[in-house]
């Protein structure tokens, strides 16, 4: 989960056999207590299920494709998470999946997120 500027708020790493919508439920429950200021989350159609909507008091707005869309089109809000993934993958350690455990993968994602924040702070200082 990231804010509209691409800063990481919450991370949840799980195995590849977990569907996005199923992984969203524990993520939203975790974020509810830690980030009570979040009122609305934007998501793609993979998260359009009643189970996700009922998991939290955070409003879920599904950003759908345009009706007349053909080919690739940048959608408002959907690209923010993908951009954050691209920034995180610039970290050499995250370029490939070297981690043996989910805990270590999560830790390195948080470390990469912290480095992004430090770079932003240094840029504005």
Predicted segments, located by residue:
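Polybasic low-complexity intrinsically disordered regions
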Residues: 1-57, 61-65, 109-113
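Basic, amphipathic alpha-helical segments enriched in Lys/Arg and hydrophobic/aromatic residues
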Residues: 62, 71-125
């Amino acid at each position: 989960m990231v804010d509209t500027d691409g800063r990481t708020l919450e991370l949840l790493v799980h195995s590849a056999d977990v569907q996005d919508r199923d992984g969203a439920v524990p993520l939203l429950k975790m974020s509810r207590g830690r980030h009570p200021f979040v009122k609305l989350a934007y998501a793609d159609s993979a998260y359009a299920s009643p189970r996700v909507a009922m998991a939290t008091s955070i409003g879920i707005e599904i950003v759908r494709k345009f009706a007349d869309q053909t080919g690739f089109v940048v959608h408002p809000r959907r690209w923010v998470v993908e951009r954050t993934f691209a920034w995180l993958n610039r970290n050499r350690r995250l370029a490939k999946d070297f981690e043996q455990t989910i805990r270590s993968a999560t830790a390195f994602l948080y470390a990469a997120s912290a480095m992004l924040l430090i770079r932003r702070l240094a840029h504005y200082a």
